[in-house]
Amino acid sequence: MNAAPVPRTFRIVGEMQRVDERETPHPMMARGDFGERAQRWRHGRSGDAFVRIFNAGRATDPWNAMAHLFVQAPEGKVNPVVTPVGDPAKMSQQIKEIARFFGADAVGITHLDQAYVYTHRAHAWRGDGTKDGNPITLNHKYAICMGLAGDNDRYMAAPSHIADAHYSMGNTLSMIPAFMLAGYIREMGYPARWHAYNSMDVNPLPLAIMAGLGELGRHGMLIHEEYGSRMHLMVVTTDLPLAVDEPVDLAVEEFCRYCKKCARTCPSRSITFSDVKDVYNGVEKWRINVDSCYMNRVAVNHNCLYCTTSCCYNKKPGVWYHTLAMGLLKKTPLRLRPLVVRPLVWMDDLFWGKRPHVGMKWLDYDSDPPDGTCDVPGCVALHRPQHKKRLQRPGPEAPSRLYPSDRPVSVS
């Protein structure tokens, strides 16, 4: 029996304080904290119609983007007739089944820790008359955490317009299960609020970890047992009586400590090679450099996704070799796991490559354009495709700074 405390990749070692959503990466980029070029990339009109319909801020008309419709919808009223709940455990099972019916691929439930509720909104939304910077009050008891998995093959075509379109489609589709589940619970007579892409009052990642959806990887993302790192996270907070789940142990601590494949493939050196974790806002974890990560996205004009596609946990769901590897990892005692991890990483490099990539053509898009082709508007420089460049080695990491999101803020 493995008696180590979980979650071991997200160890709470001190006091956590709430964070202002305005001091998280996307709002910071939008207001120019990452520089004028990044701000233009965030708001500039794209020449690609897929980019425009998935990003209201870059569209000819924001109402052409479905996500804009969702975020402008007001929160529905709670049915005054309450459906009694006799068994919270049974209700939890029913809610999970309903969430999957609405489109979620993974569901878990945890208590809503106020440390993961943002202090202020970055953007006005929900059509409820709120303004940018309004304080957030969210006193619900539970958080229903859901994940929507991306298609493995199209993710493997990154960085490309093909992978970008699929990634953005996942962001948009993730709103549907959250929106519908919150409405379903309100019709049962209980308050509920949905939180999904571009519409978050909570930080979904730590909640998903506590709800047992997966563990935190070296690359700073959730690793799910079946879907790896390609999960779009959404949350519904509510007072509906529910039974909560426990965090899981997927051997991510041992695997990430040795593997470092995401660090080797990261073109901007934004993922640390260090075996020593850092403590930020009371949590011990591996830290990524958000500045260099975002600026690389601007430089290549794509969502990079190498940290997602290179993750050894990222395989097609249900394949026998992944099921076998996961079973072996989970059943191996903690002290012996490094002996299992090393050959698994070696086999992953052998069969899927040290920098996994799938060539793909779709519509007029090609994930493997000829050398010298650049997607950045106006660029005429000769380039090698990202997946053909040299892998990173341990060495000096990209310059970093203390991001405002890592500095606790006082809650008045």
Locations of regions flagged by a protein language model:
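Flanking helices and flexible, charged tails adjoining ferredoxin-like Fe-S electron-transfer domains
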Residues: 1-12, 277-412
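A composition-driven signal for long, intrinsically disordered, charge-rich low-complexity tracts
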Residues: 51-55, 85-87, 106, 175, ...
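Proline-rich intrinsically disordered, low-complexity coils
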Residues: 74, 80, 84, 88, ...
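Glutamate identity and glutamate-enriched acidic tracts
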Residues: 15, 21-23, 36, 97, ...
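Flavin (FAD/FMN)-binding glycine-rich loop and adjacent Rossmann-like elements that form
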Residues: 82-85, 134, 226, 352-361
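Catalytic cores of enzyme domains
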Residues: 105-331
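Non-catalytic, usually N-terminal nucleic-acid engagement modules in DNA/RNA processing proteins
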Residues: 1-154, 160-161
